[in-house]
């Protein structure tokens, strides 16, 4: 396998292209009036944006990048905050039976992205204070998109 493919519906192609170019750090390789495609070599990801008249609810829980260290988490957080995104930080949190350092950003259509580093395994699924990949979109009041 070369690429994992993910396609998401978006309302505004222009806003979404702008958001994902900043998040991924690459330009879209194909742009049409109702479609855009990004190819990331590391990780191998074929990510497409598909224009829809309306995007209701969150059809996926979230997306994320697992990185190798806390330093890498902080590097991406700093980079995206410089681009004007709001980053919701969760350090030393228990989520998905693991202790993690992470932050979250939200795309123009409400899809959440996490950048996380797994520090160790845990016997519990989540801490009460952690959003742990299950925050309903209606609970999110700040859109990180500029």
Curated annotation (Swiss-Prot):
GO terms for biological process: response to cadmium ion. It catalyses: methylarsonous acid + AH2 + O2 = arsenite + methanol + A + H(+); roxarsone (III) + AH2 + O2 = 4-hydroxy-3-nitrocyclohexa-2,5-dien-1-one + arsenite + A + H(+); nitarsone (III) + AH2 + O2 = 4-nitrocyclohexa-2,5-dien-1-one + arsenite + A + H(+); 4-aminophenylarsonous acid + AH2 + O2 = 4-aminocyclohexa-2,5-dien-1-one + arsenite + A. It holds the Pfam family Glyoxalase. Its EC number is 1.13.11.-. Its cofactor is Fe(2+). Roxarsone (III) binds at residues 95-96. Residues 2-118 form the VOC domain. Fe(2+) binds at residues 5, 62, 114. CDD domains: VOC_like. The keyword Iron-sulfur does not apply. To M.tuberculosis Rv2641. Organoarsenicals are used as herbicides, pesticides, antimicrobial growth promoters, and chemical warfare agents. Arsenic is the most widespread environmental toxin and is classified as a Group 1 human carcinogen. Nonheme iron-dependent dioxygenase that can break carbon-arsenic bonds, playing a role in the detoxification of environmental organoarsenical compounds. Catalyzes the oxygen-dependent demethylation of highly toxic methylarsonous acid (MAs(III)) to arsenite, which can then be exported out of the cell. Can also cleave the C-As bond in several trivalent aromatic arsenicals, including roxarsone (III), nitarsone (III) and (4-aminophenyl)arsonous acid. This is Probable trivalent organoarsenical cleaving enzyme. It comes from Bacillus subtilis (strain 168). The lineage of its organism: Bacteria, Bacillati, Bacillota, Bacilli, Bacillales.
């Amino acid at each position: 396998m070369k690429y994992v493919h993910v396609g998401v519906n978006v309302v505004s192609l222009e806003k979404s292209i702008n958001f994902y170019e900043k998040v991924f750090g690459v330009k879209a390789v194909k742009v049409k009036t109702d479609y855009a495609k990004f190819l990331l070599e590391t990780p191998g990801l074929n990510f497409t944006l598909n224009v829809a008249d309306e995007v209701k609810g969150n059809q996926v829980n979230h997306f994320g990048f697992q990185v190798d260290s806390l330093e890498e988490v902080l590097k991406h957080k700093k980079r995206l905050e410089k681009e004007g995104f709001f980053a919701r930080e969760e350090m030393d949190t228990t989520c998905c039976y693991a202790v993690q350092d992470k932050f979250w950003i939200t795309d123009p259509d409400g899809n959440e992205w996490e950048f996380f580093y797994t520090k160790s395994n845990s016997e519990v699924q989540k801490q009460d204070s952690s959003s742990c990949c299950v925050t309903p979109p209606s609970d999110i009041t700040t859109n990180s998109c500029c």
